């Protein structure tokens, strides 16, 4: 039976919209997460706002989830997300992209970084005690192979957390109402999303790979999704800044970002919503 709400103290919430409290695994050493952090500002000072406010929501979820060590990050990218989300280093970050994973060294969020395909992990079976993949799996064409390999390197009953867009990521696009499916297909391509699926599809994928889906909840409302959509266009100046200076934000200060933060904060709620455009999953290795 899959629980469709975020975890509460007993991990079985019956209160819709309840934000998960902090949990621990008795007797298991794990990664200590950042508490009482302003994740929205921390993300805004480094990223374009349309990426920052979604990542801030996702950072908040990990504060409530146990991550017994060693921890495996599938698709760590440039390491920015982990550096802001966790107080202690993640044991291993794996990514196939040469540029981002070498940039991850600068953030210092990992004990070890491995440049490799997620479907060909160099680690022995049942090596890791927990794993996560933050907004990565939707970009992987060979998703079944990556999930199966992730299951192989996780210990029995190890938790695996991931978040991905669902079907409403595409169906709630505002410009599609005027330009039709051609725009939807184009947006899917520029955002490199191969899988925008509902929980039943993910449950089947997980089962084939050797996981059991434990929980999920939808988040990021349709209105938030449309702010993200338009941010791709309003964020063009940030792209120019990045190309010229290597930074997304020239003045990452409170006074420079307060108006942006004030605007996006109303769309950056971590509360689960039934028609959310993204879904957070908790799975367990069988």
Regions found by a protein language model. Give the residues of each.
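A short glycine-rich, Lys/Arg-flanked "PGG" loop and its adjoining helix->strand segment in the class I
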Residues: 144-159
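Conserved class I S-adenosyl-L-methionine
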Residues: 161-184
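Acceptor-substrate binding/catalytic loop of class I
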Residues: 183-201
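A SAM-dependent methyltransferase catalytic signature shared across enzymes that methylate proteins
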Residues: 202-217
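Short N-terminal helix/helix-N-cap motif within the alpha/beta-hydrolase-1
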Residues: 140-145, 172
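A C-terminal cap/extension of S-adenosyl-L-methionine-dependent methyltransferases
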Residues: 15, 177, 215-286
């Amino acid at each position: 039976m899959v629980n469709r709400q975020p975890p509460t103290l007993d991990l079985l919430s019956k209160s819709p919209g309840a934000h998960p409290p902090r949990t621990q695994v008795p007797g298991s050493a794990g990664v200590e997460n950042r508490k009482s952090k302003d994740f929205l500002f921390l993300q805004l000072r480094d990223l374009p706002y349309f990426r920052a406010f979604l990542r801030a929501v996702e950072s908040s979820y990990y504060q409530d989830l146990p991550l017994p060590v060693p921890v495996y990050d599938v698709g760590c990218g440039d390491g920015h997300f982990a550096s802001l989300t966790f107080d202690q280093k993640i044991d291993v970050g794996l990514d196939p992209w040469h540029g981002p994973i070498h940039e991850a060294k600068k953030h210092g969020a990992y004990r070890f970084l491995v440049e490799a395909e997620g479907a060909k992990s160099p680690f022995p079976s049942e090596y890791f005690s927990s794993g996560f993949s933050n907004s990565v799996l939707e970009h992987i064409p060979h998703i079944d192979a990556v999930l199966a390999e992730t299951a192989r390197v996780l210990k029995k009953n190890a938790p695996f957390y991931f978040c991905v867009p669902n079907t409403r990521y595409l169906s709630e696009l505002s410009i599609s109402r005027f330009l039709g499916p051609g725009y939807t297909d184009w947006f899917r391509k520029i955002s490199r999303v191969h899988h925008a699926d509902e929980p039943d599809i993910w449950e089947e994928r997980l089962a084939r790979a050797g996981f059991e889906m434990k929980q999920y909840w939808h988040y990021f409302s349709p209105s938030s999704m449309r702010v993200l959509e338009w941010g791709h266009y309003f964020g063009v100046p940030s792209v120019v800044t990045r190309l010229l200076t290597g930074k997304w934000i020239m003045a990452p200060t409170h006074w420079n970002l307060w108006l942006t933060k004030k605007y996006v904060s109303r769309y950056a709620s971590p509360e689960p919503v039934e028609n959310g455009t993204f879904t957070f999953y908790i799975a367990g290795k069988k």
